[in-house]
């Protein structure tokens, strides 16, 4: 009889003990995100959450997203502490533009070999994003998959569910000519356009940690977490009649603003109403990127655009500013002729 070595899951590259250590490490930060509607804690087969009692006709709103190749930049620079904020932001910002209050969030973290310190850093960032948006982190999946990822590489995805009163859903149907567009400033490129960012860094032979812009490194500018607008927008919605909100993500101005415009409507943007933050000017110059491509790829300093009646625009700017946002009137809604562009950016 031949003696054979007894193999374990750990021999195959999956360390269950490391996974358990990770859960123990993150329990405290996860607990800080708890909402009263959440039933139970981590470790169940599924997470239970009641609907807030204030809703008469609650409609659930769901979303899922990742952070694109911003994650590659974060891994290359070994900065894992804020990418989780980006992950939450990309999901909850998509929910709030429809008037929804985020309720709970789940994450998916996949890697070839689990580094507990890295994973804990990422998930701590996710918990921070949940706190900023008033959302409970109710669970997630940590997948250690040998042979699927190179070295210490990992990927993340997020899933969020929110709730909105049926009569208060914001879907753009109320947008009308004469509405004013109010912009909310972005914290940076947020989580979009990073394949182009990385190409520009490569072609221009730029080390982002050794390049300075306005007193901080280019790396800091590029890895600045995506701004979470949930609390500011929910507060605005409670006080004013909002007709539409666009979250400027992949596709920039040209593709995201039309998503909330009815047929026959056109957004006319005044480019002179704001100055691009330095990081966007640097990217355009270093990559010789056309103006059209900049507005197609990046937010160029505008994270969200709100459409509302003209007589409420000044009040909206005032309220958003009081909430800590940089806000300004960026344009108007006009009637569009058949076949006309839905977004015009006037220099």
From Swiss-Prot:
Subcellular location: Cytoplasm
Pathway noted in the entry: Purine metabolism; IMP biosynthesis via de novo pathway; 5-amino-1-(5-phospho-D-ribosyl)imidazole from N(2)-formyl-N(1)-(5-phospho-D-ribosyl)glycinamide: step 2/2
GO cellular component: cytosol
Record key words, sorted: ATP-binding, Cytoplasm, Ligase, Nucleotide-binding, Purine biosynthesis
Gene Ontology annotations of biological process type: 'de novo' IMP biosynthetic process; adenine biosynthetic process
CDD domains in UniProt: PurM
GO molecular function: ATP binding; phosphoribosylamine-glycine ligase activity; phosphoribosylformylglycinamidine cyclo-ligase activity
Entry EC number(s): 6.3.3.1
Family classification: Belongs to the AIR synthase family.
HAMAP family the UniProt entry points to: AIRS
Protein name as it appears in the record: Phosphoribosylformylglycinamidine cyclo-ligase
Species of origin: Yersinia pseudotuberculosis serotype O:3 (strain YPIII)
Gene name per UniProt: purM
């Amino acid at each position: 009889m031949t003696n054979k070595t007894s193999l374990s899951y750990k021999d195959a590259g999956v360390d269950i003990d490391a996974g358990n250590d990770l859960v123990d490490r993150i329990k405290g930060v996860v607990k800080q995100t708890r909402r009263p509607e959440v039933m139970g804690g981590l470790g169940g087969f599924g997470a239970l959450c009641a609907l807030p009692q204030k809703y008469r006709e609650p409609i659930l709103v769901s979303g899922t997203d990742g952070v694109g190749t911003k994650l590659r930049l974060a891994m290359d620079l070994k900065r894992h502490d804020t990418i989780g904020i980006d992950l939450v932001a990309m999901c909850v910002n998509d929910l709030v533009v429809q008037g929804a209050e985020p309720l709970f969030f789940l994450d998916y973290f996949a890697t070839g070999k689990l580094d507990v310190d890295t994973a804990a850093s990422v998930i701590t960032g996710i918990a921070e994003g949940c706190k900023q948006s008033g959302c409970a982190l109710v669970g997630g999946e940590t997948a250690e998959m040998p042979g699927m990822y190179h070295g210490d590489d990992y990927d993340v995805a997020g899933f969020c569910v929110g709730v909105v009163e049926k009569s208060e859903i914001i879907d753009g149907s109320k947008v009308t000519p004469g509405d004013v567009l109010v912009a909310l400033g972005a914290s940076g490129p947020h989580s979009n356009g990073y394949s182009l960012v990385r190409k520009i860094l490569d072609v221009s032979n730029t080390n982002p940690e050794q390049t300075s812009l306005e007193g901080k490194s280019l790396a800091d500018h590029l890895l600045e977490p995506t701004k979470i607008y949930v609390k500011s927008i929910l507060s605005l919605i409670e006080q004013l009649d909002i007709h539409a909100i666009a979250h400027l993500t992949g596709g920039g101005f040209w593709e995201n603003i039309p998503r909330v415009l009815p047929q026959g409507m056109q957004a006319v943007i005044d480019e002179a109403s704001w100055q691009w933050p330095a990081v966007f000017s640097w990217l355009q110059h270093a990559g010789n990127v056309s103006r059209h491509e900049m507005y197609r790829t990046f937010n160029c300093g505008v994270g969200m655009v709100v459409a509302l009646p003209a007589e409420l625009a000044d009040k909206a700017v005032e309220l958003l500013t009081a909430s800590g946002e940089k806000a300004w009137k960026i344009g108007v809604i006009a009637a569009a002729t058949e076949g006309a562009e839905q977004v015009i950016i006037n220099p």
